[in-house]
Amino acid sequence: MNQLLNKIANIPFVWNTAQNIIGANQWKSSMYPSAVDAKEGTLLDFGCSSGNETAMFLSFDYYGIDVDAPAIEAAKKKFRAYSNVKFYTVDIIKEGFKKDFFDHVLFAGTAHHLSDAELGKVFRILLDNLKPGGQLHFIDPISQPEKDVWRTRFIIGADQGKNVRTEEVYRKFFSEQSVQVTQWKIFPNPYRFIRFPDFLYVRVIK
């Protein structure tokens, strides 16, 4: 039964509709552009899925990548009218991508789908994708045991990504990467009933 539900949830239209109903996409549409305050240049969206956040970055030369081929095909259809928007099915750990090419890399909402080993590998690869002086924008939900109410814990437990980490874990992770962190910010959940976990934003300069 769980496998069937997961397959249904992974259908791009179903997933996007669910995100709209519970307000997740609306929150991201205000959070992501406020974090990535630039308006132009080359931008890599790692783990773009079916392009749920792509519309926020149409002023960029936008590249979206994901391992999920059906989601990428859905994204291509959705944004086929935009010549500056491109999507690719890529396993970045196995294949890599454009090195020293991007002004911005968006690493958003995907880290909790990665194991610790995968997180380290992906982070270093994404840094390699940046031009010197480029910016990596890391955004991911965090677990806060001292704050999270049962509704938040339920959402975290129901998420397909099983590696929601604490802020302390990420502080240790980024300190071990020997990178220049220029911004560290918590985006609190804006809703009173649907208690999403708060999101951590970290800006890194290559």
Residue ranges, per PLM feature:
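A short glycine-rich, Lys/Arg-flanked "PGG" loop and its adjoining helix->strand segment in the class I
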Residues: 120-132
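Local beta-strand N-terminus motif with an aromatic residue
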Residues: 40, 102-103
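Short catalytic micro-motifs in class I SAM-dependent methyltransferases
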Residues: 109-113
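Class I (Rossmann-like) S-adenosyl-L-methionine-dependent methyltransferase catalytic domain
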Residues: 1-43, 48-96, 114-120, 137-206
